């Protein structure tokens, strides 16, 4: 569960290391975001020479959360960290590589490019 002011690791090679959630997209009163949800965030930590700089406002999709999520078959999935992938305006990932596993929920939300780049889909 990601909300405003949540800090997330960045799971791609855009140059950002950490982002801070500004807003959860998808409704005026929406408070929490889970795997596959899109947020607006600002870059808090970045490496020199990357595609994004500290202070940039970006859109990102959540790929891992610490909070467990119940699936339709009754199983639960949770990860060791909160992580996101930075997106372009058309919904494709801005980076060319994805690090670490991603949730299967991204397939339901039509983030096929992220699914294909990810080393593992859980």
Swiss-Prot record:
InterPro entries: Ribosomal_uL14 (IPR000218), Ribosomal_uL14_bac-type (IPR005745), Ribosomal_uL14_CS (IPR019972), Ribosomal_uL14_sf (IPR036853). One of its GO terms (cellular component) is cytosolic large ribosomal subunit. Keywords: Ribonucleoprotein, Ribosomal protein, RNA-binding, rRNA-binding. SUPFAM superfamilies: Ribosomal protein L14. The keyword Membrane does not apply. GO terms for molecular function: large ribosomal subunit rRNA binding; structural constituent of ribosome. Gene3D superfamilies: Ribosomal protein L14. It comes from the Bacteria. One of its GO terms (biological process) is translation. Part of the 50S ribosomal subunit. Forms a cluster with proteins L3 and L19. In the 70S ribosome, L14 and L19 interact and together make contacts with the 16S rRNA in bridges B5 and B8. Belongs to the universal ribosomal protein uL14 family. PANTHER family: 50S/60S RIBOSOMAL PROTEIN L14/L23, LARGE RIBOSOMAL SUBUNIT PROTEIN UL14M. Binds to 23S rRNA. Forms part of two intersubunit bridges in the 70S ribosome. This is Large ribosomal subunit protein uL14. It comes from Renibacterium salmoninarum (strain ATCC 33209 / DSM 20767 / JCM 11484 / NBRC 15589 / NCIMB 2235). The lineage of its organism: Bacteria, Bacillati, Actinomycetota, Actinomycetes, Micrococcales.
